[in-house]
Amino acid sequence: MLKNPFNNNSLINKYQSLINQINTLEDELKTLTDSELRATSFKLKKQYAESKNLESLIPKSFALTREASLRTLGLRHFDVQLIGGLVLNDKKIAEMKTGEGKTLVATLPAYLNALTEKGVHIVTVNDYLANRDQVSMGQIYRFLGLNTGLIQDGMPNFDRRENYKADITYVTNYEVTFDFLRDNMALNLKDVVLRPFNYCIIDEVDSILIDEAQTPLIISNNIQTPIEKYIVAAEITDYLELNTHYKVDEKNKNVILTEDGSKQIEQILSVQDLYDPRDPWIPYIINALKANALYFNNVHYIVQNNRIIIVDEFTGRIMADRRWGDGLHQAIEAKEKLPIRQKTETVAAITYQNFFLLYPKLSGMTGTGKTAETEFEKIYNLSVEQIPTERPTQRKDLPDLIYKDQFSKWNAVAQNCNQIAKIGQPILVGTTTVEKSEMLAQLLSEYKLSYQILNAKPENVRRESEIVAQAGKKGSITIATNMAGRGTDIILGGNINFKIQKKLYDILTLVKNFKRSKKENIFSSSLLSQFEGSSQKFLSVLVSLSNDQKFLKLSDLDILKILRENDCISIPITSYQCSIRYLIDELITYNKKHQEQENQIVKNLGGLYIIGTERNDSRRVDNQLRGRCGRQGDPGTSRFFLSLDDNLLRLFGGSKIQNFMQTQIPDDSPLESEFITKSLDSAQERVEERAYQQRKNLFDYDDVLNKQRNIVYHERRNILESISVQKNIFAYGEQIITELLIELKEDKSCNIEATNLIENLFGRNLVLNYIKTSSLSISNLDLSELKIYLFNEFWLTYQSKITELSIYGEGIIENLERSIILINTDRIWREHLQKMTLLREAVGWRGYGQRNPLYEYKQDAFYMFETREELLRHLVIYDLLRSSIL
């Protein structure tokens, strides 16, 4: 019976029968050879092909995956990890604590669902994690006869398509979403890279589906931008005073111009009305004020290579490809006196909320999902299950220490670091911004303490994995902006893999570069110290590498890449890769005992000591930081240092907190107040509820556009995949004629000449057999006869165009027709997106008239979509009948 350290009886009882079946199969599979295991895997795939029933395959597929993992990686899935895999397969979110092996757990449902041959996507938050997991976990899948794919930034279309064809593909949320948008802009089927969606497992699911839910993924084109207005608006802000000319709403990230402010600006600009629709200044002024009052360098963005780079508030990482919309990004560029880049218009867009709902089967993993369970259930229909830990948690979460102001708090943090550092206990300090991480670094320098800093600055980002991996070493101090999505585990005593990587990199580059110098023997006395304690075989392998011409041609960067990506570990191909594989194994064996000693020393010191320097808006982010210590039953401690003027309390703490701040409290003494602790918890809950309502509101509005998008993309894909679109052309033309005749029937006063009517309809003059007199009025004709006549004339005109174009070669006509429909579909959709954006802004004002903005939005959006379809028909027929190859 499975032990229950988490007291989650209902979950264990639900899956106990399956766990027992999997464990029973384990002994049977252990007796099989590698080839017999692979043959069993092929039998499972055949069973599914015949029965189309995955449920019956769960026990054997999970047992197979467990055995394959043990044979390839030396890692055996614990029973609690089997539960995690079963939860994921049931289309749920598995909440697993840090270090409990989420990456390994995902292999269980991934292998099972890959048996359908419909593809599985494992989505991670960055390229590094996607590459790392594909290389390591891919060994399990390949052992069982499956292939894996990997999508990385900058990969060409051909490679993307091939990797998406794999049984299991590792990809970032960013890449797969943009591939979806690009696929739905393709003019040729060979440019489409994705196949139909099947099953998706999202790692750090709360980061993607909640924290980034409000950020749409956009493909855009540059449009003309009044750069001088941004520059002038930025200069005007120097002449405006806070609370006199404008007010700042920090909660809603907005600024409000006062009447005095409007007059002051109108006087400076010598204009009568800032809101004049013919020459509006107000959006530029508001954005300039926002840029000055609400967005700060080294907090919300950094300046790099004369560009504004956004910093993700949840992960602390830079988002080089993201830009703020509605002119805000240009306003910040003007504020920082940087070159102002062009504004853009949206060509295609989708939110993560709607994108991931396209998967028929969706699940996710996170260390912190339970606090957001309501949102997961209501928007994504995903429940959250807390997976028991393999070992009881030993982490101690100490009470918050609350200081009067920022100055006192940061001094206390530095003093605490100094005290803990004296005993050698490793420390990880979490900060919320680049600016604060660098300020703390200066304070620690005054204590002459050594530290590593990890924030959005490029020089620090490059060393992210190494910094995080070594944060558990004795005596280390690591300062990091938010820890979400930093996939490397913090191992007490340091991460042996990174130690070996660094040592082996030094050895290999020394061997390669020394050989090139040709001055002396590689193992002369001056270099012998580099290999002290190594075995004779280890030294022999180094000698063979020093004579391997392929190895000697590698650059230092090539060697680093091989070691980082572990290419040589997974599938050694060349002789030098086999040699490096041996060296790694040898160094692991040699260093393992020392690593175990270091690990025990740090455990005896109390494990990793976590310091939080501010409560975040979300409890999940705080828990992500705390969760960095106490992994796999290790000891650890966490404590938050707070001040009464932290943003959370200042903006959302309420009037009682404001009054509390006025009392006489010693600057250097922390407060222990149950009232303040409850106020903090209450403030976080209010902010979370507020954020949830904003995301829910966005989802409700975006759902309208999403339904329209699905229709357009479905119709577009049908056109793209059609051998011939002649039926569509006929349908468009006949629908145009039918709509016109309905209009004529309703409007008896119409007096249009037949020749003009046809020319307007089809973009050309026709030979009129039915109507002998060009001056004959439509009103004098029988509409049913006219309908037959116009249908015939349209068909004749179409056939005439086909004959005209057929001389240019086979397939030309089909490609032209398809391209005309696709190009006009994209053009009208692009214009529709702009109109929908304007409509979204406009309906908000209707609420002041006691009208429901969402209802108004739906009604107007429906009408706009109907007119879009009508316009498409007219443009396609007009362009086709007027088209010419030359």
Curated annotation (Swiss-Prot):
Any one Gene Ontology cellular component term annotated for this protein: chloroplast stroma
A GO biological process held by the record: protein import
Residues engaged in binding ATP: Q81, G99, E100, G101, K102, T103, D489
Domain of life according to the entry: Eukaryota
Annotated disulfide bonds: none
PANTHER family found in the cross-reference section: CHLOROPLAST PROTEIN-TRANSPORTING ATPASE, SECA INNER MEMBRANE COMPONENT OF SEC PROTEIN SECRETION SYSTEM
Protein known as: Protein translocase subunit SecA
Organism: Phaeodactylum tricornutum (strain CCAP 1055/1)
